[in-house]
Every structure is written in structure tokens, then in C-alpha cells.
């Protein structure tokens, strides 16, 4: 898919959301599987000034009830198999409706979008307008919605593309889910902001990754991606000859994984650290020593303070 086509699809989706009564500043919850239409929906919300609210596809009715009450969405975009369940949940909410993303020809968002013009939709938003509400993992209590502004997104990706040397010549291998910061913000934005290319996989599959690595220059993943790749005998320095950077985050990586991957691929993985509330915060260097077991130094314009349980430095 070309960038022109991507813009056309996103614009059609924005107009379809308009037709469903969504206005700038309204929240749009999306609990959908990773797919190209899910990317179109996300970009449509950014372009049109809607607030995108991605949810983990594993969440059940109890969690969804909390998110609906907390986010107060205008629209809940879901899948065919969950439509009836979600419809019942949103009935209790004020002024909220449910729609299927794909899979219900003539009535789903994909079908509604197809009936609209492909003329580019670009609406004026302020830098401090909320672009996305992304819910935290809830490790210390009930999951909370972090309000991420358009400025947050732009400033973070500017730093990352500079730090990690992204350019239009790159091809990112994207096998991450898109309901959290890593896959939705970091991976997508690093590519789209510089006009690079992307190999888009709907889920991680070792054989598919092995087949596509020769076409990629960058891969982002979580530690389990790399341990699973190490289980495949085809992972070699020759296979990875075109890759310039492997990035890992979202969880700590064992030193053994680091060392084995470097031996097998010829590449030292770059670890970094981020949060739902702040995006990326620290990173090991692109040039220079990447220390195993660390997440590097604070990014430019980021301050880090280490405190104890009593918030004392």
C-alpha cells in the first residue's frame, strides 16, 4: 500500500466516523485485532481530531464496563464475534453506540468508509489537544487512562527518529500488537514520520519473521520475540545482513538472550524504556556501548529521578 492510498483510506474512515455522529474531541474506543483497517482507524482519528482509545483484545466484559464508564466514548469499534456483547455494554452508557470494524459487509466501518470520498481530511488541532487515551497495565491498581497529546506524540517521535537514525530508506518489520505504546506509537510513528516502509504482520510468527528479516533494516520486539527467534536454526548473521538495528522493550531481557542473539545474528540488541504516560523515556545509544541489563540514558529533553518507596531521591 502506498502513502497516498494510506491517506485516502484514513480520510474515508474519518468521514465514516463523521457520519456516525463522532465530533472532534469525542472518544473512539477500539478493541479490534491488528489489521490494516485498524491502522486506518487510528490515523483517521488523528487526522480528524477524535481521541483514539485502544484496548487490549483480551479484556473481558468486567474490564470493558470500567473503560466505557471512564472514557465516556461516543463510539466503540469492535469485532464481529464481540459485537453483541459490546452492544449490551454500551446500551448502559450515555450517547454511545457500537460498530464492527470489518466482517459485516454493508454495515461495518470498512463498508461505510468505502462509500465516502478519498479527498484528504486534515482538521486543525492544537498541540495540547488529547490525541490518544491509552490505559495503563494496572499493576498497582485499577487501570488508568493516560491522556497523550498531539505534542507528546510529535516530540517523542522526533527524538526517536533522530536517536535511532530512521530515514525513508528504512523498512521496519512490525509484528507488535497495536493496543499499547510500543506497537501503536513507537513502531508506527518512526516509520510514518520519515516516509519509511513497513512489513506489517498481524501477529508474531517465527517462520514469517525469518522469511521477512532479509527485507528489513529495523525490527522492534519484546524479549520473547528474540528468544523464539533463537529457537530457529535459520537465524544467522547472513540472514540478518541487511538489518541495521534490533530494538527491544516492554519487558527486561535476560543477559543470556542478549549474548546468544549477538552470537547468532551479529547484532547487539538496543534496549529502551518507556511508559504509557510518557512514551519513550530512555534508550541505549545507537553508537557506542549498549549495556546488557540496562535501558540506557534519558532521551533529550527528558529528566529522570530515582526515588524509593517514599518518593525520596
Language model: regions and residue ranges:
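Conserved AMP-binding A3 loop
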Residues: 2-4, 131-158
Amino acid at each position: 500500500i502506498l502513502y497516498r492510498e494510506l491517506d485516502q483510506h484514513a480520510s474515508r474512515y474519518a468521514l465514516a466516523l463523521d457520519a456516525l455522529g463522532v465530533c472532534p474531541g469525542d472518544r473512539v474506543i477500539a478493541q479490534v485485532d491488528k489489521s490494516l483497517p485498524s491502522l486506518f482507524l487510528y490515523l483517521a482519528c488523528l487526522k480528524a481530531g477524535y481521541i483514539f482509545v485502544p484496548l487490549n483484545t483480551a479484556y473481558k466484559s468486567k474490564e470493558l464496563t470500567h473503560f466505557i464508564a471512564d472514557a465516556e466514548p461516543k463510539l466503540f469499534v469492535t469485532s464481529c464475534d464481540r459485537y453483541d456483547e459490546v452492544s449490551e455494554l454500551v446500551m448502559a452508557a450515555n450517547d454511545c453506540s457500537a460498530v464492527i470494524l470489518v466482517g459485516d459487509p454493508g454495515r461495518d466501518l470498512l463498508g461505510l468508509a468505502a462509500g465516502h470520498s478519498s479527498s484528504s481530511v486534515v482538521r486543525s488541532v492544537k498541540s495540547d489537544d488529547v490525541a490518544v487515551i491509552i490505559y495503563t497495565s494496572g499493576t498497582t491498581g485499577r487501570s488508568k487512562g493516560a491522556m497523550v497529546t498531539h505534542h507528546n506524540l510529535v516530540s517523542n517521535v522526533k527524538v526517536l527518529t533522530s536517536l535511532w537514525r530512521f530515514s525513508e530508506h528504512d523498512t521496519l518489520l512490525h509484528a507488535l500488537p497495536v493496543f499499547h505504546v510500543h506497537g501503536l506509537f513507537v513502531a508506527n510513528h518512526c516509520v510514518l514520520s520519515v516516509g519509511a516502509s513497513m512489513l506489517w504482520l498481524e501477529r508474531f510468527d517465527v517462520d514469517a519473521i525469518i522469511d521477512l528479516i532479509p527485507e528489513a533494516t529495523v525490527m522492534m520486539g519484546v524479549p520473547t520475540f528474540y528468544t523464539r527467534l533463537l529457537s530457529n536454526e535459520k537465524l544467522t548473521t547472513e540472514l540478518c545482513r541487511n538489518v541495521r538495528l534490533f530494538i527491544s522493550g516492554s519487558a527486561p531481557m535476560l543477559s543470556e538472550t542478549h549474548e546468544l542473539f549477538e552470537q547468532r545474528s551479529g547484532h547487539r540488541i538496543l534496549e529502551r524504556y518507556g511508559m504509557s504516560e510518557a512514551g519513550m523515556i530512555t534508550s541505549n545509544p545507537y553508537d557506542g556501548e549498549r549495556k546488557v541489563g540496562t535501558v540506557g540514558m534519558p532521551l533529550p529533553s527528558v529528566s529522570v529521578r530515582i526515588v524509593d518507596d517514599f518518593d525520596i531521591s
